[in-house]
């Protein structure tokens, strides 16, 4: 894919703040097909984006400083993927510019929705544009992989069948369904899931040509789900309740559960029945990232 470009008239000085979405993702299924010698797991999964997520406000500065103006509770700025992504691109491109970044955080941490990876990808794509560093999507994805296995899918921005550690992507076209996404009152450690002895690691590999784009919730599974529900009764209880209303599955390593509905009205009807303590939202699955819709249409006067 071609590198992002900006008009030559935007070539110096501080910029205004620009708004960039940082969408959530779903793993419509997640199969673990092996483990590499370096300890990383070989995965097969289908990623789809959600028309819902965090929002980042980003501006370019003539100072080389990377300044996150809205720190996230419990996460130091230096360990935040937002700051790490900006500094990594700055280092690799040797740009003289810096950035000021604000985030409106709505995606839960420890939910399996890819919030941190999405934030990192949004920063890489936005600053590549604002700094005019002209890296290609493939180059940005290589940088992103240093930050997390899910970052490349957010860089490329299309629904995909992913293999390897999640970096080998083949476009797919799942139905853009309506989902109710619900979060139990717990957070799941991805590291704890992937280091658990009870985690299945030998699911048979799929033939991508035979993948059914319409039946992800019936023909496939999430290898992490049984492990998580056995250790987290909050997840087990919520999942058991949701499947009475719609096909439902945990995304990623959890804890969020997505339920597919035929209409927004029906999804919101079930959402209204959830206990107030369960955070949830209704949205649509989309096969192009909302971030890329902004990047592709952004014009600066």
Which residues fall in each region the model found?
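ATP-binding N-lobe of GHMP and related small-molecule kinases
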Residues: 2-110, 129-138, 165, 173, ...
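A short, flexible low-complexity segment enriched in Lys/Arg and Gly/Pro that occurs
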Residues: 5, 83-98, 125, 218-237, ...
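Residue-level signal for inorganic ion chemistry
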Residues: 28, 56-58, 82, 116, ...
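Solvent-exposed alpha-helices and their adjacent loops that cap or buttress functional pockets
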Residues: 49, 145-146, 153-155, 170-175, ...
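Short, basic/glycine-rich phosphate-binding loops at helix/coil junctions
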Residues: 62-75, 145, 212-221
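Contiguous, small/hydrophobic- and glycine-enriched helical/loop subdomains that border
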Residues: 98, 124-161
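Glycine/serine-rich anion-binding loops at beta->alpha junctions
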Residues: 102-131, 247-261
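Conserved, helical-rich catalytic subdomain that frames metal- and/or nucleotide-binding sites
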Residues: 156, 160-247, 260-301
């Amino acid at each position: 894919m071609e590198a992002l470009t900006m008009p030559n008239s935007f070539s110096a000085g501080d910029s205004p703040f620009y708004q960039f979405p940082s969408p959530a993702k779903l793993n419509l299924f997640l199969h673990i097909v092996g483990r590499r010698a370096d300890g990383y797991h070989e995965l097969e999964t289908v990623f789809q984006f959600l028309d819902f997520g965090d929002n980042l406000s980003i501006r370019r500065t003539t100072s080389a400083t990377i300044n996150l103006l809205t720190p996230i509770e419990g996460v130091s700025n230096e360990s935040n993927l937002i700051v790490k992504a900006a500094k990594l691109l700055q280092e690799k491109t040797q740009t003289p510019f810096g950035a000021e970044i604000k985030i409106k955080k709505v995606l839960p941490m420890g939910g399996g929705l890819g919030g941190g990876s999405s934030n990192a990808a949004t920063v890489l794509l936005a600053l590549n544009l604002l700094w005019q560093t002209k890296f290609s999507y493939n180059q940005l994805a290589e940088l992103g992989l240093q930050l997390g296995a899910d970052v490349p899918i957010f860089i490329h921005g299309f629904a995909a069948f992913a293999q390897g550690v999640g970096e080998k992507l083949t476009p797919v076209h799942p139905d853009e369904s309506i989902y109710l996404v619900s979060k139990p009152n717990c957070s799941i450690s991805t590291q704890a899931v992937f280091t658990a002895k009870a985690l299945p690691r030998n699911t048979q590999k799929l033939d991508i040509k035979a993948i059914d784009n319409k039946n992800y919730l019936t023909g496939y599974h999430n290898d992490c789900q049984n492990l998580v529900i056995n250790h987290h009764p909050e997840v087990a209880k919520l999942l058991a309740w949701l499947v009475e209303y719609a096909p439902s599955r945990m995304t990623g390593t959890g804890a969020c559960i997505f339920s597919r509905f035929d209409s927004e009205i029906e999804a919101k009807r079930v959402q209204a029945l959830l206990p107030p303590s369960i955070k949830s939202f209704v949205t649509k699955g989309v096969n192009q990232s909302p971030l890329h819709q902004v990047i592709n249409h952004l014009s600066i006067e």
